[in-house]
Amino acid sequence: MNCFIAYFDYLGFKEFIENNDLDYQKKIIGNNFRDLESALGQGKIKDVHHGVIADLSNSKINCINFSDTVVFWTNDDSNESLKELLDVSYKFNWQAVDFFFPARGSVVYGELFYVDFKQSNEGGGQYNLN
């Protein structure tokens, strides 16, 4: 099935890893994760026992982040999905550029095949095959 896909690449990520200690890296990466969730929640928040978090309950956008790459995609090719993807992409890019890393990206239309490789073993451990 066709969908809309937004691909982003953080610029300067290699230098960030090479020039900063692990504690600082964890802080900044944690902030990036927070900003990804904030973009997906489009500014909506919900109360939880330890404060507030982004409310992703109504988001229809999928996201995967690995190393210096972020990919968002829709579940279909409707105009509503495209609008939500563009809104999420705009908020993510704005936050990335303004607070942490410049990011370059693109939005494309096409087919995406996603396989969840998460597996569990008999001992309760989880691993990923990709």
Label each residue range with its predicted role.
Residues 1-9:
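Active-site-proximal structural segments of metal-dependent nucleotidyl cyclase/transferase enzymes
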Residues 5, 65, 124-127:
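A generic fold-level signal
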Residues 33-72, 99-101, 108:
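Conserved helix-loop-beta segment at the catalytic/binding core of cyclic-nucleotide signaling proteins
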Residues 21-34:
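A short alpha/beta connector and helix-capping loop motif
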